[in-house]
Amino acid sequence: MNIANELAVRQHIKIVVTGGVTRGQSYELIGPLASLVLAELTLDWAILGVDALDPRTGATAHHEGEASINHLMATRAEQVMIVTDSSKLGQRAFARVCATDEIDVIVTDRDARPDLLAAFTERGIRVITA
């Protein structure tokens, strides 16, 4: 919700707010109402934040409702970008967002371990460090 609020003033960006239950910890809208709306959309990109990202397990989250909505966004998108800090790389959380082979791009910080970055690039994922 906070990102939608920031981008709403930019006329060249179309903002869709799904509805659903607000999750205060992450400002996400989750639940059946959000799922119903997302199921009707086609997206060019899904840009997702996650709690953990492992080369074998993929992207995961601590909260299953959050993971479910993010999974649905990933399945509705042509491209999936995961944005996460390096402390979450090589980690796993409770609920899967998407498998590694569903990820197109990872954006992380420069403190990421080279072996973990290599594990993602070997799987055909573009890795951007900034």
Where are the model-predicted features located?
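Conserved phosphate- and dinucleotide-binding cores of soluble alpha/beta proteins
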Residues: 2-130
